Amino acid sequence: MDQAKLARMQASVRIDKSATNPINRGKGTPRRKVKKVHKSSGADDKKLQTTLKKMNVQPIQAIEEVNMFKEDGNVIHFAAPKVHASVPSNTFALYGNGEEKELTELVPGILNQLGPDSLASLRKLAESYQNMQKSQAGAEGKKDEDEDDIPDLVEGENFESNVE
């Protein structure tokens, strides 16, 4: 048997008869680690499917992408999702991998999909983005002005004599 494997097995055993390790000595059988079995998400999907069947959802075909706009300006983008809907219960279910993207990444492709309220929110977002850019540029400008008053340190020169 491999010596390293034997040493690992001895270290994992609770009963140790050596006098050098009095902490682990004791009677009884060693405790064994319980292997935890994690539930797979497949069980959750099955429960969800049965609940949706009770609501009598119907699949909607030919949906290429779904975009969900968040308040912070980001978009949750689903490419080729599976969509099920139940109009009487006003319920829609989306299946697929959603990616969180910035609105600027999707702008050219989604302009024709936006409604009037989304266009208004897009304008507000563009204005806030421009204001943020201006404020950052203004902060950098103030930073540069403050740095003009501070002379650069050059090796061999003494600026304290100029102050006096």
Curated annotation (Swiss-Prot):
NAC-A/B domain ranges (all copies): 42-107
Segments of this protein annotated with the region Disordered: 1-45, 130-164
Keywords: Cytoplasm, Nucleus, Protein transport, Repressor, Transcription, Transcription regulation, Transport
InterPro entries: BTF3, NAC_A/B_dom_sf, Nas_poly-pep-assoc_cplx_dom
Start-end of Basic residues biased regions: 28-39
GO terms classed as biological process: protein transport
Top-level taxon: Eukaryota
Cell compartments where the protein resides: Cytoplasm; Nucleus
Biased composition (Acidic residues): 145-164
Family: Belongs to the NAC-beta family.
Subunit structure: Part of the nascent polypeptide-associated complex (NAC), consisting of egd2 and egd1. NAC associates with ribosomes via egd1.
Main function: Component of the nascent polypeptide-associated complex (NAC), a dynamic component of the ribosomal exit tunnel, protecting the emerging polypeptides from interaction with other cytoplasmic proteins to ensure appropriate nascent protein targeting. The NAC complex also promotes mitochondrial protein import by enhancing productive ribosome interactions with the outer mitochondrial membrane and blocks the inappropriate interaction of ribosomes translating non-secretory nascent polypeptides with translocation sites in the membrane of the endoplasmic reticulum.
PANTHER family linked to this entry: TRANSCRIPTION FACTOR BTF3 FAMILY MEMBER (PTHR10351)
Protein name: Nascent polypeptide-associated complex subunit beta
Origin organism lineage: Eukaryota, Fungi, Dikarya, Ascomycota, Pezizomycotina
